[in-house]
Amino acid sequence: MKQIIYISIFTILFTFVSCNDLLNPTPVDRIIDDQVLTDANSARVVLTSAYRDLANLGAPKIIAGDLTADNLIHNGTFTLYREISSKDMSASNGSSSALWGVIYSMSYIASFLYEGLPEIDISQLEFNELTATASFLRAYAYFVGAYTFGGIPIVTSTIVEDNRKIPRATFEETLDFVETELLYALDKLPEESFNSGEVTNGAVKALLARFYLYKENWSDAEKYATDVIEGNGTKEYILEEDFENAVVDFSTESILEIVYSANDNPGTSTSFSINNLFVGRREIIPSSEMVLALQNDGGDRQVIIEFDGTNARGSDNGWTIVRYGPFDNIQLFRLAEMYIIRAEARTQQNKISGVNSAESDINVIRERAGVPLIQGSSQNQMLLVIENERRMELCFEGHRWYDLIRTGRAKTVMDEFTSNWTDKDELWPIPLREITNNPSLKDAQNPGY
């Protein structure tokens, strides 16, 4: 059965040529045309498009997680980043549109596979693996969408005209959808793959650990983090001895990463790689507060920033992020995060000290970084230690804003960082183009936009 889908989404195309292109995004028709599903191999070709969209989700997620918070500041000329950094984001912001667009592109591709796969002759094992991969990628996209925008429309069909009328789901409904997708994918994927650029059962369990941490389901967060740490139903991931080796491509602790090459434009639907934003143009730089935090408690993790006094002038503090090279992969999940997730889940269950405790988990990460170990903390003290440890260990990987929002610490922390922070900054705006083209979103914009 021939499956043809015309996917209409709104993404952002950026070029090096014109700043106007950055500030005036053009609607793009994403077409999966003449893809004839005849066997598992043809389905994998379609699935490649979803992986390509995952790549396009990389940098916008980092921008959302670190620039919206206090880890990064704007240092260049582009309005879309200035808006985010100054907490003056508009509904026409290009980063918001890019992130929203790629979520629905991934969703359409998953729907395409779900509609087409039952019509072809493949084994049950192949069907399970293909649909589980599609479900994981769609779940990850909606997970990011829910915590960036709040509840969003849940699209599971390829009928474009119907999809343009789908109303916004609630935040809880969106998360229920994510959980259903992940639990479907669980144990249907191989434990190992050629490299960490492919979704495995370890990636499913890692996202479940993060999902349940965000949901404050502490026992399940601990369970799935432990599964990944101990290799229960996953490959054996090994914590790198040195932090510097932990953040290189295909490290022994990498669970899932976005793979880039010289032929790609890493991170967004743009010609700007994340490295170009951080190093080439220095459009975005680490905040002075982030630099000081790394100097005080980062230990070996300071390796991800460098100082050049020739850049230090005006609001430019002279520091540059060197976490990513020109075509370096973006790590979505790595083993160190699982230790920190388990530490937080254990703290919330009052398993703070002793064997199999939050302290033992957090000290694994701190010992590698070469910073003093933690002992004798109260529950509240330990939660602040973990907040800081997530900031140090996962710096510039797109977590900080989401962490501050989910823990209710955003206002306290951000009021010390900027006088511009307001409650509206706890969510990004729904892109104006989406509201214009979907009548069901007309009165559904997030407060303050």
Give the location of each predicted region.
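Membrane-proximal, proline-rich intrinsically disordered regions
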Residues: 19-65, 225, 415-449
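Short, surface-exposed recognition loops and adjoining beta-strand edges that mediate ligand/DNA contacts
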Residues: 33-34, 60-80, 155, 190-270, ...
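Conserved, well-structured interaction surfaces
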Residues: 44, 79-149, 186-194, 324-333, ...
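Inward-facing hydrophobic residues that define packing positions of alpha-helical scaffold repeats
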Residues: 47, 107-110, 114, 175, ...
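Hydrophobic-face positions in mid-chain alpha helices that act as interaction patches
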Residues: 68, 78-79, 222-331, 335, ...
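Long, intrinsically disordered, low-complexity segments
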Residues: 103, 177, 267-269, 282-284, ...
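TPR-repeat structural position
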Residues: 218, 352-355
